[in-house]
Amino acid sequence: MEKISAFIITKNEAARIARAINSVKNIVDEVIVVDSESTDDTVAIAEQLGAKVIVKPWLGYVGQKSFAESLCVNDWILNIDADEELSKELQDEIEYIFASHNQDRYLAYQIKLLIMHRNDQKPRMFAPFNKCTRLYNKKFASFANTVNSTTHDSVVFNKDVDFAGKIYLLNEAAYHYSGTSIEQLVTKANFYSSEQAKDLVKQGKKLSNFRLTTEMIWWFFKAFFIRRYFVFGFDGFVDSMIFAFARFLRLAKLRESLLKSKNVIARSEATWQSRKNNKNSTN
């Protein structure tokens, strides 16, 4: 049976890391946890569960996952986040594919991540979900192939790989627990929006006042209605507002960075002009 390496990146995930590790450890050969200097018991819990833990200062989402990926000894890699859990049915499906030696029919496998509200014990009917490539052969794809972003961490195929028809969506699902509290969601929104704003600056993105003023409205509509957060009731309304605010924040922070940069340039030009005038008056 082809062996699988699993990796998880963490930061103060003591409350959730055990659930994540326990959902993968029986179907993989190794579990690697790359921790970005947690101040809680994340490292101790992960080690107690048999994971190999490496502490690494934060490199950004893409950098951290690329580093973790590089530590995996096997070609087949399974990545989940600390706030995710493979269902028993998904564990069995993956185990069956590899036990029957059929894994190489595809280069990568997508997983449906069902969004679980923090107060739920099981998925709600019609719960929203995301499809993400999380099980893949690193000979053909890698997180390290992501360019121009430190936040949009995704598995990207090598340029010379024809992956048409080579990605399979697994039938069973994993669970994504959206947050532990409103405070945690707001803290994450603030951090993540700052990282996204840095990416936008690097990409040379511009911003209109119209987009800034309509961003929250659009993303609330998208989260609550299109992504079906309404299935969580009023809690879904609250979470949609936080999500929309996070999208607004990234643009507000982009605007702030652009204004600061503009002011720095203006001051530099004024200083240069002043020195030029002083030099001319001296002559």
Curated annotation (Swiss-Prot):
Q: What are the EC numbers?
A: 2.4.-.-
* Pfam family of the protein (one): Glycos_transf_2
Q: GO terms for molecular function, please?
A: glycosyltransferase activity
* Residues spanning the signal sequence: none
Q: What class of enzyme is it?
A: transferase
Q: Which UniProt keywords apply?
A: Glycosyltransferase, Transferase
What CDD domains does UniProt report for this protein, alphabetically?
A: Beta4Glucosyltransferase (cd02511)
Q: Which domain of life is it from?
A: Bacteria
Q: Which family does the entry's similarity section mention?
A: Belongs to the glycosyltransferase 2 family. WaaE/KdtX subfamily.
Q: What is this protein called?
A: Uncharacterized glycosyltransferase RF_0337
